Structures are given as structure tokens and as C-alpha cells.
Amino acid sequence: MRLLSLPLPTVLSGLVAVLVGYASSAAIIWQAALAAGATPTEIAGWMTALGIAMGISTLTLTLWYRAPVLTAWSTPGAALLVTGLQGLSLPDAVGIFIVANALIVLCGVTGLFARLMRIIPHSLAAAMLAGILLRFGLQAFGTLNGEFVMCGGMLLAWLLFKVFAPRYAVIAAMVMGITVALFQGKVAMSGIHFASVWPTFVPPHFSFAQSLSVAVPLFLVTMASQNAPGVATMKASGYQLPVSPLMIFTGLLALLLSPFGVYSICIAAITAAICQSPDAHPDPTRRWLAAAAAGVFYLLAGWFGGSITELMVALPVSWVQMLAGLALLSTISGSLYQALTHESERDAAVIAFLVTASGLTLMGIGSAFWGLIAGGIGYAVLTRTRRPSLSG
């Protein structure tokens, strides 16, 4: 695959996916590493290892299945580690990573997770995806409050190109935003130093208490808040892939790289939706090219390690938010359409959508999981009670 020979919108979809992933949560990983007492150099090494791991896994799975399979670090898992690693050492942290990733591999080997994912109705998966992405759409238009000129210009460029050259609409918005930001002096490039920092091996230290209090919650949060939405997102986008091999591969890769700071590698949901949308490629069978491009950008991000985080800080937050919202707009509308198509499933889908969009967190598990649970309960109750009335 030659990156330069791919359609520009396809390549840019991969770039936007990686950009959104790093911009939205890289800082949380830095905080988690700091909680374990990591130095700036060690943190940069973590970022390098994570970028390379995501690049390898994304490219391998995408090329193997010829489907847009994007991997990511677990953002909810990183948030959990910010508090869970307080007062612990780096060897303690690595021991926690190994236990959590081993549990993910075990979940894939047994096939339990795959069986659970097969029973989720398509309408609920689509509703959950729409609920996950809703905040990105709201954030995008919320940026007009503080950055009307830049974000308004991005929106106008997107609208114009959506009419005359739809595949280049997101690119036009990106260029417009950067142009305005540079003109306004809001891009601080002076503090960025591009250099590669390689990760160092940290021998693990295992503790039953730490495994129970941190590793098991990390495993549960990663599966419920990241892998479940990620698999459901693929399902909602029309890609039916075997789930257990995905869990085994990502879990094993993270397990092997745990001593270098890779606390988790899981199936992406939000960023994957960018590569699975019609904007990435009009032909669904060719959208894997966008994910492959994202894999290459992951490797580049990993090569430069901590410098990527500095770049994210240099770009205006509102630019990233507007770009993400516009890139996900077609996916949001498509997911809502799929969720509400069947009248008999509509109420349950709305429940799943609203619970997911609410941001509800219970027992450290995010709203995407609870959206599926609430929607599933609604689906079971409502479809059962409506069958007699329909037949009568």
C-alpha cells in the first residue's frame, strides 16, 4: 500500500482519526504516568510505545481483514490509572498492566465476550454509537461561542465543499481553520522539538492487592467502556468481524509491550467511526484504506513520542473540536437513522442513545456500557410486550 497514491480524503480521514485520538486524551496518559512517578523522558517513552503498538495493531488487523479496524489506548482506563497509580512505583504499574492485559487475552480465548456482543441488536449498537459521538457534535458547534471567526470559517468551508466537492469537505475545513489560526497567531509552534525517545524496559512487580484493586477494574473498564463500544461501532457501520481474534491479538500485543508502558490496546470507537464513514471513501469495501493510513500515522506519532503531545498543545482546542465534529457528522446522522428505522425497536434505541449521551458513570464504568444495558433491558421488555398486541 502506497500512502501517497491513496485518495486525499481517505488519507486525511486517517490523519484526523489519529489527531482526534491524541488531542482528546494524550494529556490523561501523561497524568497517569506522573501518578506512578515517571519522569518526562519515561513518559515520552510510554507515548512512543503506545503509538507504535497502535500502529502495528491497526495495520495488521486492517490489512488482514481488509476492513477499517482502528485500535486505540483506553481513555477511561487511563483516567482510572490517574488515581489508581497514586503512590505506586513504575514496576507496580507494569505488574498491573500485565494482569489486566492477560485478562483481556483470557476473555478472547474463552469466547465469552464474542458471545455477549452477538446478542446486541443492530439498532442498539447504532444508538450507542450516536450517543458516544453526540458530545463531539455539540462541542463542535459550541466552539462558535469563543472562536466564531475560525470555527465559523471552518463550518462555512465545510458546507460549501459539501455541495460542490463532498469528499474534500473535511479537508477544506481543516485548511480554513489552520489558515485563520495562523493569521490570528494562535498556533504556538516555537516550543515544539521533534525528537524520538525510545521506551525503556521496566521489570514488573506483582501484588495481589494491587491486581484486585487496580488491574481488575482496568480490565473491566477497558472491556466495557472501550472494546464493547468499539465492536458495536464496527457492527453499526456494517463490518461483521470475528470478535475473539481481535481481543486475543490486541490483548497479546499489549501484554508483550506492558513493560514499556503499554497499559492497554483496544478496539477504537470514536476514531474508528471517522475511518468507517462515507467521507473516508464512498465504497465501504475500500474504507479500510483510511484505517491503514491511520496506522501509518500512528507509527509516525510513536516515532516522535512526546513531541506529538507538544504539537497537540500548540493547536487551538476549538480547531480540534470543530474538526472532529464535522468529520463525525455523517456518522452521527447515519447512526441515528439506523437506530430509529424499526418502529418496534425505536423506544429501546432512544433509551440506549440518551443513557450513552448522558455521560453516566457507575462503578467506574462509562455511559456507553450502561447505554447498551439500559437499551437491552428496554428492548427485551418492549419487544416482548408488543408481540401479543401485534399478533392480535
Task: Show where each model-derived region lies.
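Residue-level signal for transmembrane alpha-helical positions in Major Facilitator Superfamily
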Residues: 23-24, 149, 225, 267, ...
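Helix-loop-helix junctions within the multi-pass membrane cores of secondary transporters/permeases
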Residues: 2-4, 10-29, 48-129, 241-329
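Membrane-embedded alpha-helical modules
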Residues: 86-192, 293-392
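Alpha-helical membrane-protein architecture signal
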Residues: 8-11, 153, 212-213, 248-252, ...
